[in-house]
Amino acid sequence: MRLPCEVEVRSCHLPTLGLKSRGKGVRAVVSLCQAPGRNELQPEARAEPGGHACLLVSTMKDRQGTSYKLRENIEQLFTKFVDEGKATVRLKEPPVDICLSKANPGNLKTLLSAMRLAHRGCDVNTPLSTLKPVKTSEFEKYKTKMVITSKKDYPLSKNFPYFLEHLQASYCSLARVDMRMLCLKNLTKLDLSHNCIKKLPATIGDLTHLQELNLNDNQLETFSVPLCTSTLQKSLHSLDLSKNKIKALPVQFCQFRELTNLNLNDNELIHLPFKIGQLTNLRFLSAARNKLRNLPSEFKMLSLEYLDLFGNTFEKPEVIPIIKLQVPLTLLESCEQAVLFYRIPYGPDIIPYHLCQDLDTAKTCVCGRFCLQSFIQGTTTMNLHSVAHTVVLVDSMGRTEAPVVSYFCSLTCFVKSSDMLN
């Protein structure tokens, strides 16, 4: 059997000599092999004769590998973090620790069980590998990082290595996301910058471990709702949508609660999602060179380290507010407010879809109540330093203020806040 993982082999004598290991593993293939007898010893496999099974550690630099006797030679197995794909094998001779990490937990447990049997001299039920050098193609299968920066290097006739965690495919003239990429379930970072992608498939949301997605310099015009409601909302930390043609982001975009870094530079955005305040973990926000006219009221709820809104077409706050009050409230408005206030679950399987849209796009008054069809809209000016530690100037005049739209559920709330309005 063979196990792809990262391996660090360190001497047990280092602590007594006052030395530390370099503490970094290398990508390797660990094999449980049949150890040859004295008359069967193969020149390419440096194994101890006479044992039943041996452990062979092969790396890209040493494909023949180094073999270690197992029978009555394991001093201790450290398996506290085996569920995280980590374990350490301490041998008596040579006195080394073989530290395994980034392994498949299930396969690692199988290997450790077989090693225990080999140590006791028992028959190992698991099929044993042969003492032969690991082929280069074998390491290719277990690659965790792949960088492609030209069209000629893009693989057309073969699949991507299944264990990839980081994939970059830039300057490849891709018109769509390659469906083969969506089979890479271990991906944590996907970089498709500098291509010609116009639409994202909803199945990107099936990459449950994806933390960083870079789509800089493509031709995207929209960001779909299914992506916003996929498992990415729990895993995605960094999203780069700069240099595209996006005009608007859906309300559901604010369900990416784990986002810490968002780049929206050089798009055609007229406004930001009005529930942007729900992105409570967001620390770095760039939306420079768009067509933003104002900021949503929930923008005040952000707590950023860095903010760049340079080069937008911010409008001057309007003196006269927009009044759309309905007195008395319609029955529909009252019911919708009650659903939101009491947090009653709703969905298209319970109420009509257009009502779900109304509830999803409800505004919040400064008093905390919800506004749907009945509200007063006013505009205030906000100093961006109140939400960000570092602020890039809004324009060449050196300003750091921007207009913010506020909503009021009643005339009373509007009057109380009138001193904040221009």
UniProtKB/Swiss-Prot annotation:
Residue windows of the LRR repeats: 184-207, 209-230, 233-258, 260-279, 280-301, 304-327
Superkingdom field: Eukaryota
Keyword Repeat found: yes
Subcellular location: Nucleus
Principal location: nucleus
PROSITE patterns documented for this protein: LRR
Signal peptide: none
InterPro entries: Leu-rich_rpt, Leu-rich_rpt_4, Leu-rich_rpt_typical-subtyp, LRR_dom_sf, LRR_domain-containing
Gene Ontology CC entries for this record: nucleus
GO BP annotation list: protein ubiquitination
Keywords: Leucine-rich repeat, Nucleus, Repeat, Ubl conjugation pathway
Keyword NADP: no
SUPFAM superfamilies (UniProt xref): L domain-like (SSF52058)
Annotated pathway: Protein modification; protein ubiquitination
Assembly behavior: Component of the probable ECS(LRR1) E3 ubiquitin-protein ligase complex which contains CUL2, RBX1, Elongin BC complex and LRR1. Interacts with CUL2, RBX1, ELOB and ELOC.
Protein's job: Substrate recognition subunit of an ECS (Elongin BC-CUL2/5-SOCS-box protein) E3 ubiquitin-protein ligase complex which mediates the ubiquitination and subsequent proteasomal degradation of target proteins. ECS(LRR1) ubiquitinates MCM7 and promotes CMG replisome disassembly by VCP and chromatin extraction during S-phase. May negatively regulate the 4-1BB-mediated signaling cascades which result in the activation of NK-kappaB and JNK1.
PANTHER family per the UniProt record, alphabetical: LEUCINE-RICH REPEAT PROTEIN 1 (PTHR48051:SF52), PTHR48051
Protein name in UniProt: Leucine-rich repeat protein 1
